[in-house]
């Protein structure tokens, strides 16, 4: 079963609320990372709104937190869903100039705040380029060259924009954000004056012990004061970091040659899909690295 630690969730929320109070930034809940809406009331006093990755997350945010801001980003929107999305979202971010041209006018006509996801082309990650939004050939975000080429053909695109959005981090500290902001200013700084907001995206491990809050807050202040924009952040994991547990049972133990194995009463595909997709090793209570403890054991789930 899953266990959620309400005290830890509340503490995470308090940390994020403190950042907002000290800097006047706004922090959203990225629902793709945590969408247990039974606990939204607990987090509600600490968040400015929700971030959705599509129609149904946006609807969830609207239904559960109707008084909060509702932001959405999707790599590509569906024509048959977009009108319904306008009923829920108040901030809509597009991934490409083509999507901005296709849906931006309708979003503006409906009174929505419109943004473009940018790619600052400055990677701060190593070892998993397939998930790095700044990796060569990335599908996520618009490079400056792509923007300039689109604007040359459709000069009216710039008038649709209220803000810019980037999301380049993954479980990282504020030093990576500072590096990213240098690239954002270098590539897109001339677009920021006159815009209303700048969204720093997610991947900020703000509630992790030892996270550099001072550098984060300096980064926020730097952009708000220099460009007069409202800064948003949309962490997901930071809201629920270290506040959830998967509790399972050992059903059987095996010995195959020199290898010790344990079969668990759980499904990797259903309960911990990141283990398969990433790959990812979740922290295990009282466990260590291979050879560190008296027994080294491979854990397997009971599904075939």
Where are these regions (language model features)?
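Active-site-proximal beta-alpha core segment in soluble small-molecule metabolic enzymes
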Residues: 25-197, 219-222, 263
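A short, N-terminal amphipathic alpha-helix
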Residues: 12-20
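Glycine-rich beta-strand-to-loop/alpha-helix junction loops that act as flexible
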Residues: 168-169, 198-207, 235-237
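Active-site loop ensemble at the mouth of alpha/beta enzyme cores that anchors a bound cofactor
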Residues: 128-134, 210-224, 228-288
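Conserved small/polar residues in nucleotide/adenosyl-binding loops
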Residues: 300-304
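Feature marks short, surface-exposed loop/turn motifs that line or immediately flank catalytic pockets
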Residues: 122-124, 170, 206, 239, ...
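A structural motif shared across PLP-dependent enzymes of the aminotransferase-like
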Residues: 5-8
């Amino acid at each position: 079963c899953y266990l959620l630690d309400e005290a830890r969730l509340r503490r995470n929320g308090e940390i994020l609320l403190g950042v907002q109070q000290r800097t006047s930034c706004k922090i959203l809940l990225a629902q793709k990372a945590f969408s247990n809406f039974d606990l939204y009331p607990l987090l509600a006093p600490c968040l400015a709104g929700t971030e959705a990755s599509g129609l149904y997350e946006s609807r969830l945010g609207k239904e559960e937190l109707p008084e909060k801001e509702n932001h959405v980003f999707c790599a590509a929107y569906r024509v048959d869903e977009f009108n319904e999305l306008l009923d829920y979202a108040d901030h809509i971010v597009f991934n490409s100039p083509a999507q901005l041209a296709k849906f931006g006018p309708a979003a503006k006509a409906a009174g929505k705040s419109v943004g473009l996801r940018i790619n600052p082309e400055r990677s701060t990650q190593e070892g998993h380029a397939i998930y790095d939004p700044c990796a060569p050939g990335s599908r996520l975000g618009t490079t400056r060259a792509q923007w300039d080429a689109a604007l040359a053909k459709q000069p009216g695109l710039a008038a649709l924009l209220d803000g810019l959005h980037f999301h380049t981090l993954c479980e990282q500290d504020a030093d990576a954000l500072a590096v990213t902001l240098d690239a954002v200013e270098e590539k897109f700084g001339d677009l920021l004056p006159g815009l209303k907001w700048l969204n720093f995206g997610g991947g900020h491990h703000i509630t992790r012990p030892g996270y550099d809050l001072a550098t984060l807050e300096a980064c926020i202040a730097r952009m708000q004061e220099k460009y007069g924009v409202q800064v948003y952040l949309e962490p997901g994991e930071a809201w629920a970091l270290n506040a959830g547990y998967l509790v399972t049972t050992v059903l059987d133990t095996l010995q195959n040659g020199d290898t010790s194995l344990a079969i668990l009463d759980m499904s990797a595909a259903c309960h911990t899909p990141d283990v398969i997709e990433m790959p990812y090793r979740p922290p295990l209570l009282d466990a260590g690295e291979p050879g560190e403890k008296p027994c080294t054991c491979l854990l397997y789930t009971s599904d075939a």
